[in-house]
Amino acid sequence: MLADFRRIPKQLKSLLAFAGLTIFALSGCTAKFVTHTSFDRPQLQQENIQKVAVFLFESTYIDMQAGSHISRLFELNLQQSGMYKIVERAEIEKVLRERGVPPSPAEPPLSLRQLGDLLKVDGVVFGSVSQYNRFNLGFTARLVSVKSGLVLWSVSQTGGRYFAPLSQVADETVKEAVLELQTKLR
C-alpha cells in the first residue's frame, strides 16, 4: 500500500491534499439549525385558533432592526404555511396607535382579551431575538390564546453560516422554524 502511494505524482498528491482540506473546511460552513418546539395539542385543538396577530419581536441587540426583521420573516413564513390567517402588520399598528399602545408591548397595557377584541384575532404571536449575526442567529416565538392566556405552542430556533449574508441566514433560520412547527402540529 505504501509503495502504491509513493508512485503517485507529487502534483497529484498536492491536489488530493488540497481537495481534502477544502472539503473539510467547507463542511463547517453549511447551515446548522437547532429547533426546539413545545405545544399543548389538546389545548390547541380546544382553542381552535384561526387568525393571529404577529407582534414585533423583542431584541436587546444594538441592531434595533433585529426584532422587526425576524418578526416580519416569521409572519411571512407563517402566512405562507397556511396554518393561520394573519392580520396585516399595518392594521395592527393602526389599531394600537389609535389606542395609544406601543406596537411592541413587552407587557401590553391591554389584556390579551382586549387585544383579541380590538384586532379580531384568536391568538397573538410574541417573540424575542437572542442572537443576530450570520454566524449565530437565534429567536423564540410563542402563540398565546387571547381567550385563555395560555401559551399554545413555542418554537426556538438557532442557525448560522460562515459564508452567507445575514439576510440569507435569517430567512433560512425562520423558514426552518416554521417548517418544523408545521410538521409537529399536523
What are these regions (language model features)?
Residues 2-16:
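Bacterial N-terminal signal peptides that target proteins for export
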Residues 17-27:
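Bacterial N-terminal signal peptides
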Residues 25, 53, 125:
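Conserved Rossmann-like nucleotide-binding pocket used by diverse enzymes
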Residues 29-53, 71, 77, 113-119, ...:
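C-terminal/domain-edge helix-coil "capping" segments
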Residues 39, 106-114, 126:
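N-terminal post-signal-peptidase region of extra-cytosolic proteins
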Residues 49-56, 61-110, 117:
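N-terminal segment of the mature soluble domain
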Residues 59-63, 128-133:
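Short, flexible beta-strand-to-coil junctions
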Residues 122:
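Conserved acidic residues
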